[in-house]
Amino acid sequence: MTSVQERLFDVRGSRAVVTGAASGLGFAMAEVLAECGARVTLADIHEERLAASTEALRSRGLDVRQAIADVSDEDAVQALFDDLVDAQGGVDVVFANAGLAAVPGFRFEDGQTFDTIERSDWDRVLGVNLTGVMHTMRSAARAMKAQGSGRIVVTASNAGLRVEPMACYGYHASKAAVIHLVRAAALELAPHGILVNAICPGPFYGTLIGGGVTESPTEEMKQMWETLIPLGRMAHPDELKGIVLLLASPASSFITGAAHVVDGGSLVQA
C-alpha cells in the first residue's frame, strides 16, 4: 500500500463490532475489517453459525472474537457494549447490521397484501430492524460519547428509499425508519465526534430471511431482480466491502448523516 492509501483507509487497531455477523452481509463486513487489521467482535443470535464464522476468520490469523446477542433485547445489547468497553477500553466502529427480511414462513413469491399483515409478524420484523438498530446505536453512542469519537453504520436497504417487489410491509417500514433515525442521530452526535451513516444495499446473495440465509434465490426472484438492476445481476456480499472500509476509515472523516446506496443502479430507475 502507498502512504496515501494507508493514511486514508487505515483501520488497523480499530475496535469494531458487527451485529448479524455470522453470515451474509454481516460476515463480509466483519471479514474486510479484520483483513485490514481491525479488532472485530462478531455478534449474532445464531450461536453455532457464529462460532463457525468466527473460527473461520481466526484460523487465518485475524483478530476476532464472538458475542451472542439478540439486538431486540436492550439489556443484552447494553451488556455487550459494557463488556467490550471493559475488555478493550472502548469501541471505535459499530456496524448495526442485524436484521430480518421477513418472518419464518414468508414466501416472497406470494407477496403480501396490506389487509393480511399479521401484527405478530410486524412486531417481530420491526423489533429487530428498527428497535434492535436503535438499541445498538444507543449503546454505541453511550460508549463513543465517553471517548469523544466513533463511527456508527446502519444496514438499511434501498427498500427504505423506494417500494421493492416481493418485500414485506414491515421490512419497507423499518428500513425507511432507520434511514431517518440515522439522519437524526448524525445531527445530534456530530458535536461529539461521532459519524453516523447508513448503507442501502440492493439485491445481494446471502439475504437474511426469517433469521436464516438463502444463498440461492429462486429462479423467479433472480430473474425479477436482474430485470430491475441496470448492471443486470444480483451482487455478492464481497461487493459491499468497499463501502464498509470507506465508512470505517479516515477516508470518510467528513461524511455523516448519509444513506449510501449500493444496488447496481436499480434506484435510479425508481
List each language-model region with its residue ranges.
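Short C-terminal tail/terminal secondary-structure segment
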Residues: 2-10, 245, 256-270
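Substrate-binding pocket helix/loop in short-chain dehydrogenase/reductase
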Residues: 105-114, 118-123, 221, 225
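Active-site helix of classical SDR
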Residues: 137, 174, 182
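Alpha-helical segment proximal to the catalytic Tyr-Lys
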Residues: 142, 187-188, 253
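Residue(s) in the substrate-gating loop at a strand-loop-helix junction
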Residues: 157
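Short, small/polar-rich loop/turn modules that mediate ligand/substrate recognition or access, typified
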Residues: 190, 195, 200, 255-257
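Short, flexible catalytic-loop segment of classical short-chain dehydrogenase/reductase
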Residues: 196, 200-212
